[in-house]
A protein has these predicted regions:
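Secretory targeting signatures
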Residues: 1-29
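Beta-strand/loop edge motif enriched in small/polar residues
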Residues: 23-230
Length: 230
């Protein structure tokens, strides 16, 4: 009597099982991404990290208050949806916070910032090798740097306003790197379309470290040090 050969069927079943497990993992990975929505008054004494699997959405008119020396860090994706009449405000609980920070892992995830005002900060927005789209950003009186780009950062920045910076630490700072408006460094290549930079202690635009980019429609005034340094 001839014994049936079940090997092809077993092989097919194993392949089908592997495909099913693979698809199951894909669905699970997609479902693990979470969305957090902020509105009203948000208080962050120790700052906040947007994880790589998280989307943070900030509603118009939201005030985000951050503890001194802390920041809002982005590993994942952030959507700041301020408007002209209801901007999102980022301020400090006490002392100076360290602003909004885009880390390398946020690159390519589609972060957008619109109508954000940053006040009472040491740094306004810092970008490490990421590519957020930022429009209608206002940074008032950042002690060190209003917008700081590192590590091949490639943001699109439209209608930037930087007002004041460095006055509160002038004569006390232990580094020259204070009172700077836009710093483009370490191979960064931003596109900046429209910027008003006024009332800074050290530099309006600081360009260094083999960086490039396209800058247009810049108005720079009342800089105590160098208007531009390249």
């Amino acid at each position: 009597m001839r014994v049936p050969d079940y090997r092809p069927r077993i092989a097919f079943a194993i392949v089908a099982l592997l495909i099913l497990v693979s698809c199951s993992n894909l669905v699970s990975s997609s479902e693990s991404r979470t969305t957090t929505v902020w509105s009203g008054n948000v208080i962050l004494p120790d700052g906040y990290l947007v994880d790589s699997g998280e989307v943070l959405s900030i509603s118009p008119g939201t005030t985000v208050s951050i503890g001194s020396g802390h920041s809002l860090d982005v590993d994942g994706r952030i959507i700041v949806s301020g408007s002209v009449s209801s901007p999102v405000i980022m301020n400090s609980i006490s002392g100076n916070h360290e602003g909004l920070v885009f880390n390398y892992s946020s690159d390519g995830l589609g972060s957008r910032v619109d109508n954000l005002s940053v006040v009472d900060s040491k740094y306004g927005v810092t970008i490490y090798g990421s590519d957020p789209v930022i429009s209608n950003l206002t940074v008032n009186n950042a002690d060190n740097v209003a917008v700081d780009l590192y590590g091949g950062a490639s943001p699109l920045i439209v209608d930037l306003v930087i007002s004041g910076g460095g006055q509160d630490v002038h004569g006390f700072s232990t580094t020259w790197r204070y009172g700077i408006g836009l710093s483009i460094g370490a191979y960064s290549t931003p596109i900046v379309k429209g910027a008003q930079i006024d009332g800074l202690i050290t530099r309006g635009v600081n360009h260094w470290g083999n960086s490039g980019g396209l800058l247009s429609d810049l108005v720079i005034s009342n800089i105590s040090g160098a208007t531009m340094a390249i």
